[in-house]
Amino acid sequence: EVNPEADFDIASNPEFLREGAAIADFMRPDRVVIGVETDRAETLLRAVYQPLYLQETPIVKTSIETAELTKYAANAFLATKISFINEMALLCDATGADVVALARGIGMDGRIGAKFLHPGPGYGGSCFPKDTMALMRIAQENGESLRVVEAAIEANGAQKAKMVKKIRDMLGGSEAGKTIAVLGLTFKPETDDMRDSPSITIIPALLEKGAVIRAHDPQGMEEARQLLPGTIVYTNNSYEACTGADAVIIMTEWNQYRALDLERLGSVMKQKIFIDLRNVYQPDLVKEKGFRYEGVGRS
């Protein structure tokens, strides 16, 4: 029912929670953004966040429009940072440089910061793809263009295709008839979220060319079964996934994949090809165990 005498306020209070760390982010936020039009709305929201007062959490008061754009702008900036370091990783591949050392070298600059300078197969999840596209749409509706954000989106799509080529090259130019173990399916660790995960693009591309995929993920396999082709063999652990494999791919950096027994791994594989799309391992350590190693921006 319509109540023309209803007394209310409108406010915007965007969340900045990370999947897998939502409780910690809620309890100890970097800042709280409140977009309000009235003193009453501001007073109410400040009261809601009063428990954070002792932590001296900054509360940023803005207009409603600014608060809404702040959410999109934050995620678009982080997505752009990821796309930037991914493109630098490709350049490092071409020149023989080490992107991990490069990231440390620029990340120690206080103007840049070390966070989100970790190259990989591209960003995914529910936030970055959605929010970058939403920001682009807002710009278009208001007669503006966001060329940097647009380039970040395009670079992210290209990164996934580059990873397919990297895998193919490590297999001698063709994945047809090759068995590939994929460790990690979700877009990031500590979640079962498969939305826009790089695996959703990369695995079908490999299957299309005749690869056999054996996969493992601590939390994402149930969801993966709904989204990925039915020919994938899902396994109980990393070593089962790698049994008879020509290559193993670290797709998602779950902690359990950071401490693999490389000797055991090599003993069950058909070929010892290690493709580290998250740069989890030191290349020399893997090579010492008899593997051919390929990372992203380092080899």
Q: What do these predicted ranges mean?
A:
Residues E1-S299:
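Structural/interface elements that position substrates and couple domains in central-metabolism enzymes
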